[in-house]
Amino acid sequence: MDVNKLLKALDDESNELLLNFTTKKIKEMNLNILKELHLSKKETLELLNKLQEYKYIDEMNELKYGSYIRWIPIEDPNDIQLTKGALFCEMKITDNGVFCICKNYGFPIRHFQISMDKNLIFQKLTEQEMVLLSALDHLSK
């Protein structure tokens, strides 16, 4: 493990929320939320595999600006699919709910919004977060 990367990750205050987790806890949290979709075991495991380096976002303060997110629209229980994702730009709170303003990655700049109430949102873990989780995994043994 690179000690300098670990020290940098520990100094970054935005990683503070991650200190209560391990890789195992994140995987369990992702699995539990996916189980609520009542998909087949195969479909659930496929989604879990695609979300290996992602953390389920339950509250808006957990989202980091500039992070890559993927989501599963849950309005239609017969059409459950994981999106390709986008970059999270900002949070918008309206009378209609809380929305994530996102930007397509690799396309001409196009902003759009997704509702936190109508989607399960997963945020990609950064390299710093992965280093920190690796250390937390080691400490939990």
Regions inferred by a protein language model and the residue ranges of each:
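Terminal domain-start segments
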Residues: 1-37
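Short coil-to-beta transition motif at edge beta-strands of beta-rich domains
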Residues: 60-78
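Short, surface-exposed beta-edge/turn micro-motifs
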Residues: 65-68, 85, 97-98
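Mixed-charge, Lys/Arg-rich low-complexity intrinsically disordered regions
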Residues: 29-65
